[in-house]
Amino acid sequence: MSQTESTKGVKITNYAAIKNAPLPADGPGAKNFSNWLLLGLLTGVPLFVTRKFHGGLKTFIFFFILFAIPILMAYWTVLSSYSPRLNEKVQFPNRGVEHYLKFHDDQLAARYQGQNKIPMETFHELYFEGKVSFKGDALDALEYRHDWASFRFTLSLFRFFLLGMIPEVIMHSRSQDEEQVRDHYDRGDDFYSWFLGDRMVYTSGLISDVNKDESLEELQDNKLKTVCEKIQLKEGEYLLDLGCGWGTLAAFASSQYGAKVTGITLGKNQTKYGNDKIASFGVDEKQSRILCHDYRDTPLPKDENGNTTKYDKITCLEMAEHVGVRKFRSFLQQVYDMLDDDGVFFLQYAGLRKSWQYEDLIWGLFMNKYIFPGADASTPLDFVVSALEATGFETVSIDNIGVHYSATLYRWYKNWLSNRDNVVNKYGIKWFKIWEYFLASSTIISRQGSATCYQIVLRKNLNSYDRAGYISTQEGLQGPISRKTDWVK
């Protein structure tokens, strides 16, 4: 089969670099969702009841508050249950639920069979509890999820959104951030090494050749070099890496480019691991170091004379999502204030598509509940760019690397499966299943555009900035220019 083969108008790919989709189907979503109708119901129902009771403004406000949540829940439930698919180019095999899943409860088996599909949120909760299993590989079954699962909103989904996620969005205190990050990242370095591999990088790598099956280490090395080249990192420059993880970028930039790097993380295990990694490359701690700090306490660097200065370059790879929507602008302002006026800010940001499908939202709530609690700032691109520009940054370039993330996640998934016994023996079967589902579903989600990742290069929007000096880093322009042919005879 060729790299892409058309089946009823839909391309079925066969690239070596990624996990190719056998059933790239679209579901229902934003195209059939009317905010105006929802607003009409939210105001119309309490207004109707108010008039029946011959009440005034206070009565209307009372009924508005009383009915708001039930109306929202009913509206989302009905639309997620009965809205038509975005398109029906891809036909489902209609094999029945029992072809893909094995229930370990007779009542559940009787309830979900044939074309009576199980809600995806219900499924993954039952899967983690051991009440249902995949018949075969998890990722293979999830590729055909439209054939056995629905994306209807459930009561437990609403409960988590209202009582779990919303309070976290509102609060996002220092203590909350510290508790969530340390609970997640200090679980144990071995836990993460069992899927991240030797590089210990928990962010997307980059594909260099879509027709080549590169290793996870090659993908991550491609990314490390790309980051340093995009910011034109030079020897002796002060680099700040916010959310540095296990310090791999800090070690790379220090040893390969001679930069003076400060890495910031809330993870205690990550701090020790990162400093040990930097030292293993023969880099003195006076040159580069990892600090266990809240990002709000990031220190400015000091020059050779002991004077406080600013950072020449700042990188932030998939950490900004943890800041929270409410704190996002203040976070960017802090970055702006710490960056030299001639400096460069590199932001790698995991975002969501604006034209969402219900599947996307259910996956996002799963991620917030089980994988990245408090990471509510994953948003569509326009929110990020608007916030950056309002802070005073100017965009140099934006690259969408969502499919690169899918390739990275697929390799993490295979690593995780190969370490099943290690995980189960130390952390239990439930943790194995949660991460198995996370890595498998995310491989699909990032490949199909539900969630994606952007590399954004930024500078301060000042009149004095040397914009011409960064033309050579704009590969999206330089690549096509270098391949052009003369057309004038």
Swiss-Prot record:
Deletion consequences: Produces only non-methylated glucosylceramides. Shows no alteration of growth and no increase in the level of resistance to plant defensins MsDef1 and RsAFP2.
Pathway note: Lipid metabolism; sphingolipid metabolism
EC number(s) per entry: 2.1.1.317
InterPro entries: SAM-dependent_MTases_sf, Sphingo_C9-MT
GO biological process, one term: sphingolipid metabolic process
Membrane topology according to the record: Multi-pass membrane protein
GO CC annotation terms, alphabetical: membrane
Alphabetical UniProt keywords: Lipid biosynthesis, Lipid metabolism, Membrane, Methyltransferase, S-adenosyl-L-methionine, Sphingolipid metabolism, Transferase, Transmembrane, Transmembrane helix
Membrane-spanning segments: 29-49, 59-79
Catalytic reactions on record: a (4E,8E)-4-sphinga-4,8-dienine ceramide + S-adenosyl-L-methionine = a 9-methyl-(4E,8E)-sphinga-4,8-dienine ceramide + S-adenosyl-L-homocysteine + H(+)
Gene3D superfamilies: Vaccinia Virus protein VP39
Positions bound to S-adenosyl-L-methionine: 202-203, 239-247, 265-270, 295-296
Protein origin, superkingdom: Eukaryota
Main location: membrane
GO MF annotation terms: methyltransferase activity
Coiled coil start-end: none
Compartment(s) of residence: Membrane
Entry function: Catalyzes methylation of the sphingoid base component of glucosylceramides (GluCers) at the C9-position. Sphingolipid C9-methylation requires 4,8-desaturated ceramides as substrates. Glucosylceramides play important roles in growth, differentiation and pathogenicity. The methyl group at the C9-position distinguishes fungal glucosylceramides from those of plants and animals, and may thus play a role in host-pathogen interactions enabling the host to recognize the fungal attack and initiate specific defense responses.
Family under the similarity heading: Belongs to the CFA/CMAS family.
PANTHER family, per database record: SPHINGOLIPID C9-METHYLTRANSFERASE A-RELATED (PTHR45197:SF1), SYNTHASE, PUTATIVE (AFU_ORTHOLOGUE AFUA_7G04190)-RELATED (PTHR45197)
Official protein name in the record: Sphingolipid C9-methyltransferase
Organism: Komagataella phaffii (strain GS115 / ATCC 20864) (Yeast)
